[in-house]
């Protein structure tokens, strides 16, 4: 396609599914802080007055899961009983077992480089030159809107804002380049006494306009603010939340393929996470080097086997090299065995909670080692 319209969405840290993601990654972080080789597959379910944490965890450390959960919920902003969900008084249930020995036998290896993949599957990484972060523009701007909403809420600049919110940005493309924002949808939970007219004006003037580039906004850009007219009841009171239910928000907003496995709550031996980071790392360096305008990488694995089953690069006709030549460069210069990915991207020492909101890719924090452009010379 050359001329088209494309939409991506983001959600706030107070969205039920994102609460679940953050709790799962908070548990993971606490374990890896004391046991870098801990094996974690942590799933979280949140609903009215209840948090259920389950999964398979093998570690030599102790973690007070209940306290981790309560701290994270209150940090997000659910610290008031009037919100209907409060980290200080909700019920917390934990149901954790050890990792299956049948799985562990395929992963455990004294030689870190030969650690087998934690499961079969394929992952995708993507990059394009639409934004400075080499991310697709719709998801990039949708995330920025949610960051702005959280900032105004936490700084008490708009005191009527509440933690739950969603954004959606639609861009019009010509010749595969974003030229204008067609519409912005933003729904935010709010105090019951704020008037709809005042809310709409504040969201447009304080959230949208300071965040989105003026050259992409125009007189016909449509602003759809809290379209139902009221969003007082939100968070887990309105909808239950589950870990891994926002995988498109977490990745590329639908602009690229997704292997299907979520990221949050998984230690880096799980290729759903570590290999997806590696695929982004490769794709970003290809685009960052100017070799291609767009690049999508697929890597696939078999459980218990270190080397990938397959590697494929797609540059959509924008590269100076063929897809086959690009793939050959990748396999020659990047070690995609899980153990080497973990070592080279320093995945045992990450703060994974930072990834659980506003996307795992396109971030400027040094914590996001897979965003480094330190391999561009390979592709020049």
UniProtKB/Swiss-Prot annotation:
Q: List, separated by semicolons, the cofactors it needs.
A: Mg(2+); K(+)
Reactions that this protein is recorded to catalyse = L-methionine + ATP + H2O = S-adenosyl-L-methionine + phosphate + diphosphate
Which positions does UniProt annotate for K(+) binding?
A: 43
Q: How is the cofactor bound?
A: Binds 2 divalent ions per subunit. Binds 1 potassium ion per subunit.
Q: Which CDD domains match?
A: S-AdoMet_synt
Q: Which residues bind L-methionine?
A: 56, 99, 239, 270
Q: Which GO terms describe its molecular function?
A: ATP binding; magnesium ion binding; methionine adenosyltransferase activity
Where is it mainly found? cytoplasm
Q: Which InterPro entries does the UniProt entry name for this protein?
A: ADOMET_SYNTHASE_CS, S-AdoMet_synt_C, S-AdoMet_synt_central, S-AdoMet_synt_N, S-AdoMet_synthetase, S-AdoMet_synthetase_sfam
Q: Where does the record say this protein resides? A: Cytoplasm
* Positions that bind ATP: 15, 164-166, 230-231, 239, 245-246, 266
Q: Please name the GO terms of the biological process aspect recorded for this protein, alphabetically.
A: one-carbon metabolic process; S-adenosylmethionine biosynthetic process
Annotated residues for binding of Mg(2+): 17
Write the Enzyme Commission number(s) for this entry: 2.5.1.6
Name the UniProt key words of this record, in alphabetical order. Answer: ATP-binding, Cytoplasm, Magnesium, Metal-binding, Nucleotide-binding, One-carbon metabolism, Potassium, Transferase
According to its UniProt record, this protein's enzyme class is transferase
GO CC annotations? Answer: cytoplasm
Pathway field: Amino-acid biosynthesis; S-adenosyl-L-methionine biosynthesis; S-adenosyl-L-methionine from L-methionine: step 1/1
Residues of the region (Flexible loop) are 99-109
> Its quaternary structure?
Homotetramer; dimer of dimers.
What does the record give as the function of this protein? Catalyzes the formation of S-adenosylmethionine (AdoMet) from methionine and ATP. The overall synthetic reaction is composed of two sequential steps, AdoMet formation and the subsequent tripolyphosphate hydrolysis which occurs prior to release of AdoMet from the enzyme.
Q: Which family is it part of?
A: Belongs to the AdoMet synthase family.
Write the protein's name: S-adenosylmethionine synthase
């Amino acid at each position: 396609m050359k001329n088209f319209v494309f939409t991506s969405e983001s959600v706030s840290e107070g969205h039920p599914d994102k609460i679940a993601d953050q709790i799962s990654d908070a548990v993971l972080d606490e374990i890896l802080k004391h046991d870098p080789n801990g094996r974690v597959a942590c799933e979280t379910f949140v609903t009215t007055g209840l948090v259920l944490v389950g999964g398979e965890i093998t570690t030599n450390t102790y973690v007070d899961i209940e306290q981790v959960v309560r701290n994270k919920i209150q940090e997000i902003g659910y610290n008031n009983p009037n919100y209907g969900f409060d980290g200080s008084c909700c019920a917390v249930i934990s149901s954790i077992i050890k990792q299956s020995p049948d799985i562990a036998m395929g992963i455990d290896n004294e030689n870190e480089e030969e650690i087998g993949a934690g499961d079969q599957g394929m992952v995708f990484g993507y990059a394009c030159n639409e934004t400075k972060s080499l991310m697709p523009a719709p998801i990039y701007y949708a995330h920025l809107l949610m960051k702005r909403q959280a900032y105004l809420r936490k700084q008490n600049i708009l005191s009527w804002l509440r933690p739950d919110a969603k954004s959606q940005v639609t861009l019009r493309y010509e010749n595969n380049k974003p030229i204008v924002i067609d519409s912005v949808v933003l729904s935010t939970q709010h105090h019951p006494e704020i008037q709809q007219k005042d809310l709409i004006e504040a969201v447009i003037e304080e959230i949208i306009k300071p965040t989105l580039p003026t050259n992409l906004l125009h007189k016909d850009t449509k602003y759809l603010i809290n379209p139902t007219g009221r969003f007082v009841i939100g968070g887990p009171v309105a909808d239950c939340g589950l870990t891994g239910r926002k995988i498109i928000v977490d990745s590329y907003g639908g602009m690229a393929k997704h292997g299907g496995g979520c990221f949050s709550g998984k230690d880096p031996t799980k290729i759903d996470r570590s290999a997806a980071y590696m695929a982004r790392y490769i794709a970003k360096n290809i685009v960052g080097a100017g070799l291609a305008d767009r690049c999508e990488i697929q890597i696939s694995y078999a459980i218990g086997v270190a080397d990938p089953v397959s590697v494929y690069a797609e540059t959509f006709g924008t590269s100076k090299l063929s897809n086959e030549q690009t793939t050959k460069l990748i396999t020659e210069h990047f070690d995609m065995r899980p153990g080497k990915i973990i070592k080279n991207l320093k995945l045992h020492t990450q703060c994974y909670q930072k990834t659980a909101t506003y996307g795992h890719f396109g971030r400027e924090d040094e914590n996001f080692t897979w965003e480094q452009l330190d391999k561009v010379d390979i592709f020049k």
